[in-house]
Amino acid sequence: TYSVGGLILSNSGAITANYWLSEIYDQEIADAHKSGAIHLHDLSMLTGYCAGWSLKQLIQQGLGIPGKINSTPASHLSTLCNQMVNFLGIMQNEWAGAQAFSSFDTYLAPFVKVDNLSQKEVKQCIQSFVFGVNTPSRWGTQAPFSNITLDWTVPRDLENLPAIVGGKEQDFTYGDCKKEMDMVNKAFIEIMTEGDADGRGFQYPI
């Protein structure tokens, strides 16, 4: 699909790739890439490839950009889902490849517990996250390339730690949130299975 943002990305990417091949790599490597003997991935971007991030840090500190805008730690699941989408979008502007969150279900579960959310409410929150990371908001009108991991059961290194909501420790642990983890996972699977309004499958998160 044509877009001005996509055209800008294509043109700037070609210029950046030529810079890599003429100024960074030696002639032998550049020639090998041009001939197809080897492939240098994402030459169109002068940056690192993929990165993984701790949801715990976002939950404890909130989302802020120096000199731009600062958000306090999320106190509700809907707010956290919005912050996650924004975080992934921001990080994708600085990296070429995927941005990942680990223990997605474990860290979201306490927010479900604190607000005593229903399955329908959980699904609405997760739905906003999934649609958010599939919106072509990244530079070049691309959706943020995002990965998450689901624990299914609370990891041993987290099960006895106080759960964090709103940047504060709660009077229960992550291990006390297995029921809420199941709710998050159920909602996620249903949303990914159902697809968008036209029934198309979602590309992200992987």
Identify what each model region corresponds to.
Residues T1-I206:
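Conserved catalytic cores of very large enzyme subunits
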